[in-house]
Amino acid sequence: NSLYIIDDQGRLVERYDKMFLVGAHKGITNDLRHYSPGSHFCVFEIRGVRCGAQICHDFRYGELYREYKKRGVELMFHSFHNARMSAARLRRLNIWGIVVPASMQSYAANNYMWISTNNSSTPPCAWGSFIARPDGVVTGKLKNARPGVLVTTIDTRASYFDASEHWRDRAIRGVYHSGTLVRDDRSSRRKAF
């Protein structure tokens, strides 16, 4: 479960190893049967844009996106393989087709970063590859279970709506409120109206 970053000259630039492998805490199951987890945040540049990489199940841990944000990442490449399951299982249990796109849009908006979310086109698959811009809006999407190439202009200088821009850095530092706290008797009584 690794992603190799290769530059436009064909040189190996970096490697990302999936940090959160699928598997139970007790016992060796699923991914944990075959792989060991990574411990390295993969940050690299493409034409001056700081980029990061993640794999599949890593999306369940928003803390990884926050750490990449702290490292200045503006564009995340998040690779998935939510495909090749039976059509019956996909119909019965396609949480990925709902949860993954919603999570990626939320992570894009919460961290003000572009996210390229690719998935296998092997049918049946849970969802088609897409790009979310820093306000969470999906700017391009491939059809589900069809091979294709998605071309999107990514301009990190463009300005998008960012509801948390004023307080995000404080929250990252552990200050969990906006503005200035006020000491007030009524505010400190938690079990009174």
Regions found by a protein language model. Give the residues of each.
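C-terminal beta-strand edge segments of enzyme domains
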Residues: 110-114, 119-193
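Active-site catalytic loop in hydrolytic enzyme cores
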Residues: 1-79, 84-85, 93-102, 164-170
